[in-house]
Amino acid sequence: MAEERPGAWFGFGFCGFGQELGSGRGHQVHSPSPLRAGVDVCRVSASWSYTAFVTRGGRVELSGSASGAAGGCRDAWASEGLLLVLRAGPGPEALLQAWAPDSALRGEPLWAHSVVPEAVEEDDPGGEAQIGRLPLLPCARAYVSPRPPFYRPLAPELRARQLELGAEHALLLDAAGQVFSWGGGRHGQLGHGTLEAELEPRLLEALQGLTMAEVAAGGWHSVCVSETGDIYIWGWNESGQLALPTRNLAEDGETVAREATGLNEDGSQVKRTGRVEDGAPAPFIAVQPFPALLDLPLGSDAVKVSCGSRHTAVVTRTGELYTWGWGKYGQLGHEDTTSLDWPRRVEYFVDKQLQVKAVTCGPWNTYVYAVEKGKS
């Protein structure tokens, strides 16, 4: 059996601050473009104005409004308020450093904190690139917020496995595959059926009994993928980021007939369509406060998910990439700036015979890791 060739990272979308996105010409890239240093990169974290790349050799490199590089790094997490860098410390400890982006990796950090990691998880089979765990700390007992108070403890009984931060809310996936949400809820992004805020992590009851494998937080929407490959999505649908019919795109002629299944408060299913048969106006969805079950074309199973501010990207079990939502800067990768309220496959990777393994979205851009098909 031949060894699998190393993969590469690709980028597309907004690059108005000079952050590396493939060719990086102008302020936007409309189609996936290889990163110049993509072969050596193993993790990517993108904020609005800059991106942090972590290499396999443990080096973090910044591109965009923030610049600089440093070695001895395990992970990095970029936000407009803070750059977090996890560095190897003495013995089993790791050192978490926080920097202001405009002075990142120069002089002394704003603050530093020693953490003792839990057992390191093995990479997926094949050794493909993994997305970092920050802002969840390696001890899984706390996380870091880009706004004060920066260090926020988590109840030990939560047994956090993954934590994602939106603009105003947080999602947590625990070791049992349950989802918790808290923070602002004015766009339904918490999934509890109301627009009320939650001060503490609250179990997402609509998904009880379903084991989730991944969660992702957009600016004001949320997505999770189950172990069986199902997608559940909720929150704000202003730009079609939920793949549900939205008035904004219908007025632009972008909405097409399709169907999605939602969950009522009692767990019963309700179906909504983009157009009804008699031509009557569609029941547009502005806010979806409960998880909706979303089917990809051809019944494809999802394995990875990431969200931008108002767009969503999903990787299927067969290595295809689907994107939808806000596309003004080409962040959907469809060679245009069209916004979509339905999942569309990114044909670039199909045409190039590439299998997508990972995706991570910045607010207005998207980064993808892919390998050549048939080389393993």
UniProtKB/Swiss-Prot annotation:
One Pfam family recorded for the sequence: RCC1
Disulfide pattern: none
Domain of life according to the entry: Eukaryota
Keywords of the record: Chromatin regulator, Chromosome, Hydroxylation, Repeat
Region: Interaction with KDM8, residue numbers: 1-169
Record-linked PROSITE patterns: RCC1_2, RCC1_3
Keyword Repressor: no
(3R)-3-hydroxyarginine modification, residue list: R141
Chief localisation class: nucleus
Per-repeat ranges for RCC1: 6-56, 176-227, 229-317, 318-371
Single biological process term from Gene Ontology: chromatin organization
Subcellular location: Chromosome
Gene Ontology, cellular component aspect: chromosome
UniProt xrefs under PANTHER family: RCC1 DOMAIN-CONTAINING PROTEIN 1 (PTHR46849:SF1)
Quaternary structure, from the entry: Found in a complex with KDM8. Interacts (via N-terminus) with KDM8 (via N-terminus).
Function: Plays a role in transcriptional repression of satellite repeats, possibly by regulating H3K36 methylation levels in centromeric regions together with KDM8. Possibly together with KDM8, is involved in proper mitotic spindle organization and chromosome segregation. Plays a role in regulating alpha-tubulin deacetylation and cytoskeletal microtubule stability, thereby promoting cell migration and TGF-beta-induced epithelial to mesenchymal transition (EMT), potentially through the inhibition of KDM8.
Stated name of the protein: RCC1 domain-containing protein 1
